[in-house]
Amino acid sequence: MGKECRDIVELKEKLGIYVDDKLLLQAVTHTSYAHEQKDVVDHNERLEFLGDAVLELAISETLYKKYPELPEGELTKLRAELVCELSLVKIAEKLDLGKYLRLGKGEDSTGGRDRRSTLADTVEALIGAVYLQTNYDQTKQLILDLFKDQLSHIDNQRIGDYKTMIQELVQDRYGDPPKYQIVKESGPDHDKSFVAEVQINNEVVGRGSGKSKKEAEQNAAHFAFQKLSK
């Protein structure tokens, strides 16, 4: 088995989804490689164009459903953070994508395998190839798997922001800051759970649980914010 065939098999295993060999090979083919060949070779720019659109739709839909309380402007910011070049490069590095690229000699000799723009474009081309081979739902699932760490990071950021967000909301409406209280503590010392309540003018507006007091308060703030911003 030649190197290209081995590379394609490896990449398929990493993606965990069937893609036609020819289509997958096209997805990792840079324009510089195609231009150096005597025979006509398809490069990945059209697949990148398609993958970019599918990626944006999948992330937009995910954020829309995940954060029903956020306005359009905030959703746009989160999407931009997720589909930026840095985010795509992290995914490329996780797949060791540079190893599989088909590059022209000049591009290869000048560091093309590590070039951020090339890696990011190739991730989008792979998404385009998967979409053509399968369907939107399967491609979306692959995207969610690939972006799992980035989505989790945003989740953690959002939870951390809710205490600040509800503080601003409550002080603007009521003048006084919200108050937090731990109302339940259970479990052994090495595995405790906590329940917190957030109160506004002595009225409980949110309750949340967590493995630490801070997490419980953050989750209570999240619940309260969703309730008050309806």
UniProtKB/Swiss-Prot annotation:
E.C. number: 3.1.26.3
> Where is the protein found, in the record's own terms?
Cytoplasm
Q: Which residues form the active site?
A: 52, 124
Q: Where are the transmembrane segments?
A: none
CDD domains, sorted = DSRM_RNAse_III_family, RIBOc
DRBM domain segment(s)? 161-230
Q: Which residues of this UniProt protein bind Mg(2+)? A: 48, 121, 124
Q: Which residues form the RNase III domain?
A: 8-135
Cofactor(s) named in the record: Mg(2+)
Tell me how this protein assembles: Homodimer.
**NCBIfam families reported in the protein's UniProt record:** RNaseIII
What does the function comment of this entry state? Answer: Digests double-stranded RNA. Involved in the processing of primary rRNA transcript to yield the immediate precursors to the large and small rRNAs (23S and 16S). Processes some mRNAs, and tRNAs when they are encoded in the rRNA operon. Processes pre-crRNA and tracrRNA of type II CRISPR loci if present in the organism.
Q: What is this protein called?
A: Ribonuclease 3
Designated gene of the protein = rnc
